[in-house]
């Protein structure tokens, strides 16, 4: 990454940030985080009969098999009596996964804020701090999302492990493409955050490289004291003062730094004349 130019880092961080924002937005708004299917095993020919199949998101549950086929309900109403779920574990899964909902929402807000700040920083690259701020927001957005994903997975695993085993019933579940989009957006947002922070360090190093060193500043005498705290750059020193002024200042400094000549009495004067 040390060989990447600032333009390449700007382009890559923008692309990664835009893709991360798009994927997490699609994931939050769609209903394909989890697929679940329940049924019974027929003992005669060992075939299965699907009793209920659904796909669930953060906001809705939609049934595509069973008695409720073709029906979608909001997540907070899936426990209504008229909805026929085969086992209580399915209800518990749909209930516990709601604890993970706030984290993807916070992640979506943070990545949107980071994307806006990042674009402002690209438009005005002289504001170096914006790249650093956007990188921090990208990283925080990814961390918030991964916390939500971990809670989502752990809630499902806990309910599946507590599910009683039965030879007459079966239960299958798998994660959908909305969940895959959310996981992919985590990688993209972390990548955008790392590149934004690196872009900040690169721009800051370039500013320090072209900034004049303090040793190139020289003091200027003021009217109120012999040593002034005001400083000018060498170019400004030569441009702002004429040669006669500079020579007069140098002569003043020399007279102030050297002691006056010693005067001897007249009677101690020794003549060097041969007469």
From Swiss-Prot:
GO terms for molecular function: calcium channel regulator activity; channel regulator activity; voltage-gated calcium channel activity. The chain crosses the membrane at residues 8-28, 103-123, 129-149, 179-199. The modification Phosphoserine is found at residues 222, 225, 273. It is found in: Cell membrane. Detected in heart left ventricle. Widely expressed. GO terms for cellular component: AMPA glutamate receptor complex; cerebellar mossy fiber; early endosome; glutamatergic synapse; L-type voltage-gated calcium channel complex; neuronal cell body; plasma membrane; postsynaptic density membrane. Interacts with CACNA1C. Identified in a complex with the L-type calcium channel subunits CACNA1C, CACNA2D1 and either CACNB1 or CACNB2. Acts as an auxiliary subunit for AMPA-selective glutamate receptors (AMPARs), such as GRIA1 and GRIA2. Belongs to the PMP-22/EMP/MP20 family. CACNG subfamily. Regulates the activity of L-type calcium channels that contain CACNA1C as pore-forming subunit. Regulates the trafficking and gating properties of AMPA-selective glutamate receptors (AMPARs). Promotes their targeting to the cell membrane and synapses and modulates their gating properties by slowing their rates of activation, deactivation and desensitization and by mediating their resensitization. Displays subunit-specific AMPA receptor regulation. Shows specificity only for GRIA1 and GRIA2. This is Voltage-dependent calcium channel gamma-7 subunit. The gene is CACNG7.
């Amino acid at each position: 990454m040390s060989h990447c130019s600032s333009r390449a880092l700007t382009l890559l961080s923008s692309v990664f940030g835009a893709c991360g924002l798009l994927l997490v937005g699609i994931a939050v708004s769609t209903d394909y985080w989890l697929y679940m299917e329940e049924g019974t095993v027929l003992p005669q020919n060992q075939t299965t009969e699907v009793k209920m199949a659904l796909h669930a998101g953060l906001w809705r549950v939609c049934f595509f098999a069973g008695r409720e086929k073709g029906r979608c309900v909001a997540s907070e109403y899936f426990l209504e009596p008229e909805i026929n779920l085969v086992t209580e574990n399915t209800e518990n899964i749909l209930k516990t996964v709601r604890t993970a909902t706030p984290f993807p929402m916070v992640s979506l807000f943070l990545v949107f804020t980071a994307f806006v700040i990042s674009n402002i920083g690209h438009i005005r690259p002289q504001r170096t701090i914006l790249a650093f701020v956007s990188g921090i927001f990208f990283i925080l957005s990814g961390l918030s999302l991964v916390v939500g994903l971990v809670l989502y997975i752990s809630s499902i695993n806990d309910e599946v492990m507590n599910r009683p085993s039965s030879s007459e019933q079966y239960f299958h579940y798998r994660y959908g493409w909305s969940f895959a989009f959310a996981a992919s957006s985590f990688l993209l947002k972390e990548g955008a955050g790392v590149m934004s922070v690196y872009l900040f360090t690169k721009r800051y190093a370039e500013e320090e490289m072209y900034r004049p060193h303090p040793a190139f500043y020289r003091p200027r005498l003021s009217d109120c004291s012999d040593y002034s705290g005001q400083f000018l750059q060498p170019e400004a020193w030569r441009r702002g003062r004429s040669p006669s002024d500079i020579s007069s200042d140098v002569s003043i400094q020399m007279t102030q730094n050297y002691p006056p000549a010693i005067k001897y009495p007249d009677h101690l004067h020794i003549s060097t004349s041969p007469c």
